[in-house]
Amino acid sequence: MAQLPASMRRKRAAITSIHDKPPTRKQKLANAGGWVLLVIAFVVLAVGIYGLYKVITDATVAKLEVVGSTSSVETQQVMQHVAPIIKANYFTSDLEQIRDKTLEISWVDRVVVSRAWPNGIRVRVMPRHAIARWGTGRLLSDGGDVFSEAEPTIHPELPLLHGPVSQSKMMMRRYNEINQLFHPANLRLKELYLTERMTWFMQFDSGLRIIVDQDQTMNKLQRLSHLAQSDLKPVWSKISAIDLRYRNGLSIQWKNATPPKIVNGQFVVTIDDTSIAGGTKAKP
């Protein structure tokens, strides 16, 4: 069997002797110091985690703060409504649950809930904006939602709408469309009613009353708006009420209960023996 050269055998023996050499005292101390530092780091980490756990679990119940409300009554109502579910602290409070609970309040449109250091929950509410009164004691928002105020207030400046709550959004659209139709005639809705049978009753700020059924409602109103600026313009101020529940016509009720005369196909109303339609004297 072949043997390695003497020089290679001596080199291999030297390498083996180096690896088999026991560690020095300095090396032992260095290794021990590393383990001590590792244990200390672990202890510090454990103490920190435990301390954080105690801070979270022992913190007092979060303090509720309400912003965005327009009155102290609204603020108090939000706090009373939400307070029963505020049982956790700053860290553990369920913000989504608080938001959903706040949205149950009728007059609240939107809600943003956030944490307020050091131990508060901030509830920012955005109240609904009313564009009309709805029935008795309620309001209609610009989003078409029927709601109640925190503190009921009379709003005589707002128009009155009344109908099935399920139709509130549709009624809001109709309200805006009708106002646009009759704007050229300087009319604006004061009251708008919708019955269960979908019949519309409306009264304008001039006192004019109109009734129309669900059959081609907007087409009939559009034709009337055109007549108000053309054929009916001379007598428009003399009309008390108009019934549009006819397929191809309408019924007019006059303020003085006496309809104006028709001369040459035109309405003629006499005021002090002077006609206002055609510029001629009215015939007796």
UniProtKB/Swiss-Prot annotation:
Question: What task does this protein carry out?
Answer: Essential cell division protein. May link together the upstream cell division proteins, which are predominantly cytoplasmic, with the downstream cell division proteins, which are predominantly periplasmic. May control correct divisome assembly.
State the Gene Ontology BP annotations.
cell septum assembly; FtsZ-dependent cytokinesis
Q: Which Gene3D superfamilies match?
A: Cell division protein FtsQ/DivIB, membrane protein fhac
HAMAP family in the record = FtsQ_subfam
One Pfam match: FtsQ_DivIB_C
Describe its assembly.
Answer: Part of a complex composed of FtsB, FtsL and FtsQ.
> Which residues does the entry place in the Periplasmic compartment?
53-284
What the entry lists under InterPro entries is as follows: Cell_div_FtsQ/DivIB_C, FtsQ, FtsQ_C_sf, POTRA, POTRA_FtsQ_type
Domain POTRA, which positions? 59-128
Record topology, Cytoplasmic segments: 1-31
Whether Cell division counts among this entry's keywords is yes
Keywords, comma-separated and alphabetical: Cell cycle, Cell division, Cell inner membrane, Cell membrane, Membrane, Transmembrane, Transmembrane helix
Q: List residues traversing the bilayer.
A: 32-52
GO CC aspect terms: cell division site; plasma membrane
Top-rank taxon of the source lineage equals Bacteria
**Main subcellular localisation:** membrane
Q: Organism source for this protein?
A: Acinetobacter oleivorans (strain JCM 16667 / KCTC 23045 / DR1)
Report how it sits in the membrane. Answer: Single-pass type II membrane protein
Q: Where in the cell is it found?
A: Cell inner membrane
Q: What is this protein called?
A: Cell division protein FtsQ
The coding gene here is ftsQ
Family note: Belongs to the FtsQ/DivIB family. FtsQ subfamily.
